[in-house]
Regions:
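N-terminal, charge-rich interaction modules
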Residues: 1-63
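Residue-identity detector for threonine
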Residues: 7-12, 32, 49, 60, ...
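Aromatic-enriched hydrophobic runs in primary sequence
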Residues: 9-16, 85, 110, 146, ...
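Generic secondary-structure transition motif, activating predominantly at the C-termini of alpha-helices
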Residues: 17-24, 89, 144, 148
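C-terminal functional extensions of proteins
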Residues: 116-174
Length: 174
């Protein structure tokens, strides 16, 4: 039988680990298109993702736990992206940055992957072409909140509709 003291220690330890993961995200940007300019703007001093624990990008996926997929992914890049994802440290999170990464954008053709969630699990989607820096920071804060709670918000295996995505990232009124 588990005592209340043991449960308290486990719960407190889980909360501490969640807090540490929330504020120490090691990011790896996989930048392929024009959203890369907006990603650089978010990383620079005016918006500064370092204030939110997602500091300087790492030079190898083995050192990172947050993958930013920024821009269009074509079928030739798909194996490289999947390999980068496999090399990342666990637990890992993925953000689809912009309309092209989330759904293929306006590149509806034979060469473009229609959303990176067809290849790897995606935890958060940032809409826009390109997305505003405020939207990127809002997404990062919401992902950190979910990391602190110990859950991944959206996984690729789930049946997620466009309405679910809109509801997920709609502004909170309460």
């Amino acid at each position: 039988m588990i005592s209340q003291d043991e449960t308290y220690v486990t719960t407190t330890l889980d909360a501490a680990i969640g807090w540490c993961r929330k504020w120490s995200l090691f990011s790896y940007p996989f930048v392929t298109a024009c959203c890369g300019m907006e990603f650089m703007a978010v990383s620079c001093s005016h918006y500064d993702t370092d204030r939110f624990g997602a500091a300087l990008p790492r030079f190898t996926p083995r050192q990172s736990d947050l993958l930013w997929v920024v821009g269009t992914i074509n079928h030739k890049q798909a194996p490289v992206l999947m390999r980068v994802y496999e090399q990342m440290a666990d637990p890992k999170w993925v953000i689809a940055f912009g309309a092209c990464a989330a759904s293929g954008g306006f590149y509806d053709n034979y060469a473009t992957v229609q959303g990176v969630d067809k290849l790897i699990p995606v935890d958060a989607y940032i809409p826009g072409c390109p997305p505003r820096p405020e939207t990127v920071l809002d997404c990062l804060i919401k992902l950190q909140r979910d990391i602190h709670r110990g859950k991944n918000p959206i996984l690729a295996g789930d049946d997620v509709t466009h309405t679910d995505l809109l509801a997920r990232w709609a502004p909170r009124t309460s």
